[in-house]
A protein has these predicted regions:
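Class I S-adenosyl-L-methionine
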Residues: 20-28, 38-178
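Redox-cofactor binding/interface segments in oxidoreductases and associated redox assembly factors
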Residues: 15, 32-33, 75
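SAM cofactor-binding core of SAM-dependent methyltransferases
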Residues: 1-19
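Short, charge-rich amphipathic segments
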Residues: 1, 29-35
Length: 178
């Protein structure tokens, strides 16, 4: 309702994603989305991650990707996604990466804390950028990779740079602090 009032000339459909016929979604180059975060808590062993009541909405995004095959994806979720579920830490994120790989996407991701950009609260989010391997950007990503890609050429490199703490420990400790 708020979106419609602010953008009255935009065709907006607020249909439950579980009721959408994916074939009827218009062709698009970029799919931007997020999925509910409640099932990614690592504070409780009851959180079910990708198998939870709301966590399963990732699978709707994945189904849309399989049907529409957009060239690019930009997804967002809480940082807890990286360690979910608590009994198999990291499983859910690994599943998401594997799903995208299976659909021939290259993936770059970054955990971004709003406090690092002037906001008065710690609000860490994981952003996932994926592009088809057949795109110019995908080919470049697969060719370059490694530290150079993450620090200089990657999708997030300029706007969200990685701050290397120590040249002795290398980039691994900054990218994979867990």
């Amino acid at each position: 309702e708020c979106y419609s009032k602010n953008f009255p000339d935009i065709n907006f459909d607020n249909t439950d994603i579980n009721k959408v016929d994916y074939e009827k979604i218009p062709k698009h180059t970029l799919l931007v989305g997020g999925f509910p975060c409640q099932d990614y808590s690592v504070a409780t062993s009851q959180a079910k991650g990708l198998q939870g009541k709301k966590g399963v909405l990732w699978w709707n995004i994945y189904d849309i990707v399989k049907v529409k095959k957009p060239k690019y994806l930009l997804l967002e979720n809480v940082d807890r996604l990286l360690n979910s579920p608590s009994k198999q830490r990291g499983r859910d994120f690994a599943v998401i990466l594997a799903c995208l790989r299976d659909e021939n996407y290259s993936v770059e991701w970054r955990m971004i804390n709003a406090a690092d950009y002037g906001f008065p609260q710690k609000r860490r989010r994981v952003f996932i950028f994926a592009c088809k391997n057949t795109t110019k950007f995908g080919k470049k990503m697969n060719k370059e990779q490694g530290e150079s890609w993450i620090l200089k050429s990657g999708f997030f490199a300029k706007d969200f740079p990685v701050k290397i703490k120590s040249f002795d420990t290398g980039i691994q400790n900054d990218l994979f602090p867990f």
